[in-house]
């Protein structure tokens, strides 16, 4: 009798769908065997980047490309005046592969090149699919592949780095908008100017957006053209490697925001009609074009596509020493309708035949491969449908991600701020939303990410304070709206952080309430960089209130990080009284008490808590966080015995709770 998969054992409600779950699991097992071949492994299979593309050999150069629909292929570039010449014609071999070998002296480091691909009825210039370096001409704006063979390639100093994940505290960032200046930041500037800030703040991982080359800067890196090339607008491959190496030396893991859910439509720069056909890498029917993203959808049922994408995962892990990936657009991959306009209200919605089983197989194999290449690697899914098993082990019947993004939380905060008066904020609803997750899957909590900061949306601080940010952020300027916004910003972030069961993520600048929105240069804004940067000077200034939020974030991150395995300790609710708007919960020896009431401060407020002594750790009302110092931090609180609760080891913890404040206490028996 076949053994029941663990995800079904752990959730009896999945039993009616066991055939579908087992079928998906079996599909992945079968496909892995097929790809690995007799005596091989998935790790062996994922070596396309070592065969295709341009490689230096002992005798010269070798170049290969998969282009089954092509009738002729030429290598063109600065070395042959960009013309088709017989000596640079590729030869077709088995499997639709084209190859050429060249003498050593034909190509040099820095040379630019492309392919000229011919097919029945047409031809076009193409950037090689496996190009590891593409650059854009500043005058013509044309992209080309570039030979990258420096005389002294970068050598990593930190070997065998192991990420700290107990808990995982992620700083989401974008290299280009990482500087104060109105322009594009570089890998080197980020390494020198931003990494030290992240280290000081206490985050133990960074998640870098927009690494894979993309023609349009304003796409935020999500319309990828060259999947193996680190974006050259930020610097060289060696400078990115140095950044990652430096992060590792500081104990900071580096996660890459990887895009395997779709590709840019561009044909000259990207994979669209690479060999003249419509279905080489992508679906050839109505599924080819994404209905919402103006991009192309991969055909995950093709082994050549799996070869390309799986090898891509391995390439970034080995070549650049990334510590894992946050997979973008997973919902779009999982469903034929990309999850668009669909409400996921029951388990039926996950097993009704509307799922792309080929994509599920790919994601399962990708997770298995990544963890084989690096057992300490981190994988995170950006997925909003709530697909069960997404962050369960493959061996348990899951898809194999380590974490899933808790995407309902930022939506909850936006809805609460927009639609509810302060006096209607309910602690019961807040606690339920923050802890409503599958017991056997780890999540990444967050109050907001880059999505909420984009033009057309608003960050939490901007929703709370709005235009008063422009006029009333001086330390000596007392404005009720600003005070309210700062108080709630602190509470929202701490309650979201304190309830994690896996990790937490913050987008750069949001920790100190960076004003306004993100808007990359485009025709509609006059190609301005004004809103595509981070104004670090705001948090550095002693006369501005941003410093209060920055200091609070630093201290709560260090607090959670100081508690090993904080994310694994049970979240024990002690008190949630909607009438008073008070919430209290315990994790290990820390007790978090929130008073969301906008107008009432409570003296000697009683909370039922384990009997013992409670000492102050921090509170949001301290003046270093922009508060009023209404709480005496020197007082130790002994619980008051109550005959009704004493048999259970519980007593009354009496506290002073200022309005719109949170305090953290340490419990001692």
Per-region residue spans from a language model:
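Catalytic cores of secreted or luminal carbohydrate-active enzymes
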Residues: 535, 544-563
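Substrate-binding/active-site clefts of carbohydrate-active enzymes
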Residues: 135, 153, 157-165, 170, ...
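Conserved, mostly hydrophobic/aromatic
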Residues: 65, 115, 173, 198, ...
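Short proline/glycine-enriched turn/loop motifs at strand-loop junctions of beta-rich domains
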Residues: 66-73, 609-612
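C-terminal beta-strand-rich structural cap/linker in extracellular carbohydrate-active enzymes
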Residues: 109-113, 590, 634-669
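Active-site rim elements
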Residues: 178, 350-355, 476-485, 537-547, ...
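Conserved alpha/beta catalytic core and glycan-binding cleft of carbohydrate-active enzymes
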Residues: 135, 143, 321-323, 341-532, ...
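The feature marks proteins involved in alpha-glucan
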Residues: 1-62, 83-84, 89-172, 177-182, ...
């Amino acid at each position: 009798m076949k053994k029941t998969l663990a995800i079904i054992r752990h959730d009896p409600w999945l039993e009616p769908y066991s055939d579908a779950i087992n079928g998906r699991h079996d599909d992945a097992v079968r496909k892995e065997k097929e790809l690995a071949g007799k005596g091989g492994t998935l790790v062996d299979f994922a070596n396309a980047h070592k065969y295709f593309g341009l490689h230096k050999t002992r005798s010269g150069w070798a170049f290969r490309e998969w282009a089954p629909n092509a009738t002729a292929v030429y290598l063109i570039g600065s070395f042959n005046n960009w013309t088709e010449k017989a000596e640079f014609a590729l030869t077709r071999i088995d499997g639709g592969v084209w190859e050429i070998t060249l003498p050593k002296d034909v190509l040099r480091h820095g040379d630019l090149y492309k392919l000229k691909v011919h097919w029945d009825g047409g031809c076009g210039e193409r950037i090689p699919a496996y190009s590891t370096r593409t650059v854009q001409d500043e005058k013509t704006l044309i992209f080309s592949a570039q030979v990258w063979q420096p005389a002294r390639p970068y050598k990593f100093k930190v070997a065998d780095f192991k990420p700290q994940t107990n808990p995982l505290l992620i700083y989401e960032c974008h290299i280009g908008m990482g500087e104060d200046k109105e322009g594009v930041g570089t890998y080197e500037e980020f390494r020198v100017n931003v990494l030290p800030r992240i280290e000081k703040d206490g985050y133990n991982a960074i998640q870098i957006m927009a690494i894979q080359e993309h023609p349009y800067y304003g796409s935020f890196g999500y319309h990828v053209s060259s999947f193996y090339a680190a974006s050259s607008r930020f610097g060289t491959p060696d400078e990115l490697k140095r950044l990652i190496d430096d992060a590792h030396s500081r104990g900071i893991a580096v996660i890459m925001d990887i895009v395997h859910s779709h590709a840019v439509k561009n044909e000259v720069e990207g994979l669209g009609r690479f060999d003249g056909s419509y279905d080489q890498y992508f679906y050839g029917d109505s599924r080819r074009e994404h209905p919402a993203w103006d991009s192309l959808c991969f055909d995950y049922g093709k082994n050549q596509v799996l070869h390309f994408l799986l090898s891509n995962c391995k390439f970034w892990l080995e070549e650049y020493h990334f510590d894992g990936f946050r997979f973008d657009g997973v919902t779009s991959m999982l469903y034929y309708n990309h999850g668009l306009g669909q409400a996921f209200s029951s388990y039926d919605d996950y097993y009704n035949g509307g799922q792309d089983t080929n994509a599920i197989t790919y994601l399962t194999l990708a997770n298995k491969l990544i963890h084989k290449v690096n057992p300490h690697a981190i994988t995170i899914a950006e997925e909003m449908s709530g697909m069960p098993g997404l962050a369960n082990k493959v061996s348990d019947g899951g898809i194999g991600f380590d974490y899933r993004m808790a995407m309902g939380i930022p939506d909850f905060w936006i809805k609460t701020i927009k639609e509810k008066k302060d006096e209607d904020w309910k602690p019961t609803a807040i606690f339920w939303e923050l802890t409503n997750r599958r017991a056997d899957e780890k999540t990444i909590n967050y109050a907001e990410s880059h999505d909420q900061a984009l033009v057309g949306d608003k960050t939490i601080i901007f929703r709370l304070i709005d235009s008063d940010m422009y006029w009333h952020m001086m330390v000596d300027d007392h404005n009720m709206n600003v005070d309210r916004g700062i108080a709630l910003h602190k509470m929202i972030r701490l309650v979201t952080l304190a309830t994690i069961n896996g990790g937490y993520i913050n987008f750069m600048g949001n920790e100190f309430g960076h004003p306004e929105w993100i808007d990359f240069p485009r025709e509609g804004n006059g190609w301005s960089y004004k809103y595509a940067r981070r104004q670090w000077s705001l948090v550095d200034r002693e006369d501005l209130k941003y410093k209060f939020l920055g200091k609070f974030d630093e201290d709560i991150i260090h607090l959670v990080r100081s508690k090993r395995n904080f994310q694994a300790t049970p979240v024990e609710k002690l008190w949630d009284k909607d009438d008073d708007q008070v919430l209290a919960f315990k994790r290990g020896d820390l007790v978090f008490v929130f008073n969301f009431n906008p107008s009432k401060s409570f003296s000697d407020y009683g909370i039922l808590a384990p009997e013992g002594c409670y000492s102050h750790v921090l509170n949001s009302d301290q003046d270093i966080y922009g508060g009023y110092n209404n709480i005496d931090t020197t007082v130790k609180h002994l619980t008051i015995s109550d005959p009704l609760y004493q048999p259970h080891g519980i007593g009354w913890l009496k506290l002073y709770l200022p309005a719109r404040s949170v305090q953290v206490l340490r419990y001692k028996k």
